[in-house]
Amino acid sequence: MKIFKFLLVSILTSLLFACGDDRTEESEKIEQVFYTVMPKQEYKLNPQSYFGNERALLTQLFEGLTELKTEGVRLVSVVSIEHSDDYKEWIFTLRNDLKWSDGEKITASTYLDSWFDSLENSNSNEVYRLFVIKGAEDYYNKKTDRTSVGIKVQDNKLIVSLNNPIKNFDEWVSNPIFYPIRKENRDLSLDKKIVNGAFKVSNFTNDEIILERNENYWDKINTKLKEVKISLVEDGIMAYEMFPRNEIDYFGEPFYSMPFDRLNQVNTLPEKLIFPTSRYWYISIPNENKEKFFENLEIKKLMYTVSDPEFMGKVILENDSPAIFSHSHPSSDILNKAKEDFEKIKEKSNFNFSETPYVAYFENNNLLEKKLLLSTIKEWIGQFKIPIRVTSNSDLGITFRIEKYLVGTNNMNDLYYYINYKYGSNIKSDEEFLNTLPVIPLLQEYDTVLSHSNVRGLNLTPSGDIYLKYINIQ
């Protein structure tokens, strides 16, 4: 009897271990491959100059000194950051184990040479970010030499001097324009690019991009994904439909913009996630036909008064994206007063509208831009009787244009550096912005995205980036 019991216990124990082994084996068999989709467009993979959703690829392939997170930064290529009491001098001490994907060492001198190369060769608007460095803008405009620029190297430390104090300069350097570069990349095919991020390109075709782990990445041991497979699809609806068919793990920014006419459906799905970003929408006034009336500050203030960013966030984007500045839904009293004030200014200036409608421009095939623009233009037409035509035809003289910009830091006031650079203003505070209105501010965009539950470690940073190296599939 004892022998029988012993045999029974042995059999049961073996079965239990076998089941445990099966579960372990099953867990190990989970494919660490992340599937998503991006637009079918031209990709150059150049941190100095990129377009559209290309930033989503650059942040996987390249790495800067820091990564932006909800509060402050994560140190990645540096072991420490120091700054002077007045925040004008910054010292970045780099890791000693940094390498390019081809094994070549990365040092502080690599960053110094890369930043100078960007000042010499970048034709992107993003180069303005470097202009906060002492002497950088003059060097960019070929007025001085390298010795006048506030960048130098001591041992493996990158020492940066700024024109003015910037308390969050460690956030600024998380943006791609500050990434290190390899000059050879200009002559290399996309699948041969030399990179320093967690992934590198293993295959690039017209229909698919495949990324694989970079074995020379300093933190490769913590990169769980083996591959990233990105389908390239031109049509937004077709790309979106890949998610409910389980062909992809994730859909949305920063890889693909959510199609506007699918937002209603998206909001009913349990896989929906919403993340705040530092992307800001506004309406600029290029005024290419030189109508002095639209340069009148009081007119611009009235145009801003009747706008309704709250409506845009709640009804158009459907995710409560907030107004850039506190701006409640305009009441009928506010609208009526704005209308009266507008007519007084118009009459006093003896101005008559053009017989040809003024052009309000949005990008071709961008339905979200069109809806956001229309929601404001209809108020300008309704309250002020301004003849305006909303179109994506850029051949006509543009008077108004809807635009957005990704600040890439946690400080909304950093938007003013871009506004000052692009529109020639000198704004330093919210009060100055609202008193001068170089553009009509609208809202801060929140991103609505879709992710299946098997994707763990997913997070959109305030700059709208996703670092896939932190993701694993379960």
Report the location of each language-model feature.
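N-terminal lobe/hinge region of extracytoplasmic solute-binding protein
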Residues: 37-85, 116, 194
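Aromatic- and charge-enriched surface segment that lines or borders ligand/interaction sites
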Residues: 80-127, 293
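Surface-exposed binding/hinge segments that line
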Residues: 127-183
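A structural "hinge/loop" feature
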Residues: 38-56, 77, 104, 168-179, ...
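Gly/Pro-rich hinge or "lid" segments in bacterial periplasmic/extracellular proteins
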Residues: 161-223, 227, 237
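Ligand-site clamp/hinge motif
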Residues: 185-187, 216-261
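Ligand/substrate-recognition segments at binding pockets and active sites
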Residues: 206, 345-407, 447
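Detector for C-terminal structural segments
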Residues: 302-334, 368-378, 396-474
